Structures are given as structure tokens and as C-alpha cells.
Amino acid sequence: MQTRRSLAVAISALGLLASMQGADAQSGKVTVVTSFAKDVTDPVKRAFEKAVPGAVLEVQNRNTNAGVKFLEETRAGNQVDLFWASAPDAFEVLKGKKLLQQYSPKATGIPEKVGAYPINDRDGFYFGFAASGYGIMWNERYARANRLPEPREWQDLAKPAFHDHVSIAAPSRSGTTHLTIEAILQGEGWDKGWRTIKEMAGNFRQVTERSFGVPEAVNSGQVGVGIVIDFFAFSAQASGFPVKFVYPSVSTIVPANVAIVANAPNRAGAEAFIEFLLSPAGQEVLLEPSIRRLPVNPAVYAKAPADYPNPFTDPRLGKLMPFD
């Protein structure tokens, strides 16, 4: 009997020790490579570190293509736990090169699709945390001063009235711009799509190196119109800038994603970050004025401002084209 009691105590102690070790493993440095600007990463970092005591999120900011290349070049001595970006095709590239590892998030309340697009990778290598749409942002004061009409479609930006008034990020450096170009080509067809893109290009005043260089130029009035991902415009509006935004009929809604990097040095910390980002608390952080992203948990929209876009209920967004 005494032996059985001793064995039970030992098993109980081992279980407690394992749970403590699991909690400790979530703490420490969690390193993420991301294309997102500090306006997005700083609020998430603060909320995550508060939710997971002892965790320290180290943010390495690189544009999407540079981030992919960095993970390729450092795979032998990888020191990164997570990759966090908007463009789904970047995650497919990393997955194809076996630079991501599988995981099964425990978070609930997230549907399988946003519009026609799956939120998570079907093989479990990356996970949508926010929905993203692509469109046209413009500065109302600039537009009035320069007598610009309100753009509604991509073809509008090819009209003579917009000459020298449009900004875009280089698609070779920006994953979101690359996806926008892909959406136009898929939606309009190869020949018509390229004609639209080339005609718009004739009106470009600047081509920035980073995606967030475009909204910065529009917000300041340096240029009048920008081709952007939606949350750049929504966060600018929340900050009081005189800007408007429209989804052209040829556009799409796709998830922005997060993934655990293969051979992540802090796998438990990476898992904790994903669970936080997909939890109600993490999803609510996306509603903050400096972020203004579209959560993938439909229930979170109950806490959003009245005019907040909702891809799960807004018929305008539901009609946007599927993307492959």
C-alpha cells in the first residue's frame, strides 16, 4: 500500500513538473519575422506579453520577399520562430521549401472560409489571423484641390485625370502589391489585365520600396491616390486623416497569415503566440485604431465600430472575386 501511495505521489509530481515546464517553455524570447509596420506589431506585442507572462516578442521587420529569402538563407542555423505577413503566396513558397512546420491551433469560433478563400492552410502549415482586401485609397483634400474624381475601379486610375497622382509599392518587394497585380490579372484576364496595369503605370508618381510608404504619402498629401491593402486606409481614417477607400469590383478578400518556422528554437512560444493571435483577446487587438484589420473570428465584430467592414456579413465584400 505504501508503495502504491509513493508511486501515486511520484506520478502526480511528474505531471505537475511537466505542466510547469510547458508554461516555462512558452516564456522567453519569441522571434518573429514580419512585413507589418510598428503600428501593427507594437500593440500586438504589448498584448501578447501581457497575456503570456515571461514572453518577450522580438520583431524583425522585413518586406515579404526579403523575409522569405532570409528564412531560405538562414535555414541551417535558424533563429526565427514565426513568419507573419499578409500575402498567402509567400507562405506557399515557404511551405514548398519545407521551411514551415505543422501545427493544429486550439482556438475556436473561426470558420473554414472568408468569402471563397480558406482561412487556414489545409495541411496545417499556416493560419489566417485577419482578412485582407485590396483597393484604392485617396486623400479627399488633395482630390478636391486637384479636381480629381472619386475612383471606383482600377481602370479609373488609368484615366488622364490621374496622371502623376498615383502611388504604388513595388510588386517585386511588396507581397500585398504582388497579390493585387495577381488579382487584376485573374479577374480581368491576362491581356486585358496587363493593359489595365500598364495604363495605370503611366499615371504613377512614385513607386515605393515598402507597402506602408504608399499610405504615408497619401496621408500626408504627397500624392493623392494609393493602391493599398485595406487596413492602411482604415487605420488612417481612425487616426483622423482625410482619406477614403474603395474595393474595386475586381479585387479579393484573402487571409493574412502566421506560421511556425521549421526548427523554431522556441516552438512552445511560437504556439502560444498563434493561440493568442487567434483567441478573442488577440482578435480584439486588431480593432485598435492603429491596426484596423478584419478579424477572422466573426463574433469579434460585435465589439467593432458601427461602420466597420465585416467580410462575413457585408454583401459588397461577399461579391468580390475568388482568388487562386
PLM feature spans:
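Early extracytoplasmic/lumenal segment of secretory-pathway proteins
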Residues: 26-92, 215
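Short helix-initiation/N-cap motifs at beta->coil->alpha
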Residues: 61-69, 89, 155, 201-216, ...
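A structural signal for short loop-to-beta-strand junctions that line the ligand-binding cleft
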Residues: 78-83, 101-140, 155, 164-168
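Ligand-binding "clamshell"
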Residues: 94-102, 121-123, 235-247
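A bilobed periplasmic-binding-protein/Venus flytrap-type ligand-binding module shared by bacterial periplasmic
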Residues: 137-142, 254-269, 286
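Periplasmic-binding protein-like
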Residues: 165-169, 276-297
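Ligand-binding pocket segment of bilobal, Venus flytrap-like solute-binding proteins
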Residues: 183-247
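C-terminal capping/gating helix-and-loop segments adjacent to ligand/active sites or protein-protein/ligand interfaces
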Residues: 289-295, 299, 305-324
